């Protein structure tokens, strides 16, 4: 079944501007600016006023309508990023060998360096994405805080760190060591 026209309306909060040129969305807010290229998705954008955007799909089937809702969510994530930012907290889990995590600079690029994982000599390094800041928590032992404006960059960095600390060739029910995401949220907490 084809839907002749399907609309989604996205409200823009105060202090945020959204510019759309040739399906490249640029969102500017108090925390900075984010850009997302949506040229591969066949949707139409109309600014109702400066406070709302109408996203439309013409003659779309179920997959196109689902893509419409995806586009709305992506832009909503950009708006949240430039207003509140995103923060992931990661905890180090180990039974015997304490995991040693440092943030290092190498060739002008920042890396997270993971040592002594399961007592291994191998040093694991994860590149920190652009626009993402990492710090080792001063209040909580064995905690890494990943924060930034782009949800994609922050969550991908957290996933990269969690993935590089996977236990291989052992029973994962017994060997629970690793670095796991313990908390997700925004930098600016809602009251």
UniProtKB/Swiss-Prot annotation:
A Pfam family: Ribosomal_L6
Compartments in which it is found: Cytoplasm
**Which GO MF terms are attached to this record?**
rRNA binding; structural constituent of ribosome
What keywords is this UniProt entry annotated with?
Answer: Cytoplasm, Ribonucleoprotein, Ribosomal protein
Tree of life domain: Eukaryota
Q: Which GO terms describe its cellular component?
A: cytosolic large ribosomal subunit
Q: Which residues form the signal peptide?
A: none
Please give the SUPFAM superfamilies that the UniProt record associates with this protein: Ribosomal protein L6
Q: List the GO biological process terms.
A: cytoplasmic translation
What is known about its subunit structure?
Component of the large ribosomal subunit. Mature ribosomes consist of a small (40S) and a large (60S) subunit. The 40S subunit contains about 32 different proteins and 1 molecule of RNA (18S). The 60S subunit contains 45 different proteins and 3 molecules of RNA (25S, 5.8S and 5S).
Chain's role: Component of the ribosome, a large ribonucleoprotein complex responsible for the synthesis of proteins in the cell. The small ribosomal subunit (SSU) binds messenger RNAs (mRNAs) and translates the encoded message by selecting cognate aminoacyl-transfer RNA (tRNA) molecules. The large subunit (LSU) contains the ribosomal catalytic site termed the peptidyl transferase center (PTC), which catalyzes the formation of peptide bonds, thereby polymerizing the amino acids delivered by tRNAs into a polypeptide chain.
The similarity comment for this entry is:
Belongs to the universal ribosomal protein uL6 family.
The name of this protein is Large ribosomal subunit protein uL6
Organism per entry? Candida albicans (strain SC5314 / ATCC MYA-2876)
Lineage per the UniProt record: Eukaryota, Fungi, Dikarya, Ascomycota, Saccharomycotina
């Amino acid at each position: 079944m084809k839907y002749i026209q399907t609309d989604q309306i996205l409200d823009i909060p105060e202090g945020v501007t959204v510019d759309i040129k040739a399906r490249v969305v640029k969102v500017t807010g108090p925390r900075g600016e984010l850009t997302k290229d949506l040229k591969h998705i066949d949707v139409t954008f109309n600014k109702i006023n400066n406070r709302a955007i109408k996203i439309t799909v013409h003659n779309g089937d179920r997959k196109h309508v689902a893509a419409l809702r995806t586009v709305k969510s992506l832009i909503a994530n950009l708006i949240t990023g430039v207003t509140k930012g995103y923060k992931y907290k990661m905890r180090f889990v180990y039974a015997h060998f304490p995991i040693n995590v440092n943030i290092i600079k190498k060739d002008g690029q920042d890396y997270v360096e993971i040592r002594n994982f399961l007592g291994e000599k191998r040093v694991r390094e994860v590149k920190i994405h652009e626009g993402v800041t990492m710090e080792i928590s001063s209040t909580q032992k064995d905690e890494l805080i990943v924060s930034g404006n782009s949800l994609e960059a922050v969550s991908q960095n957290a996933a990269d760190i969690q993935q590089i600390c996977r236990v291989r060739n052992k029973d994962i029910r017994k060997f629970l060591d690793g670095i796991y995401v313990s908390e997700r949220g925004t930098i600016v907490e809602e009251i």
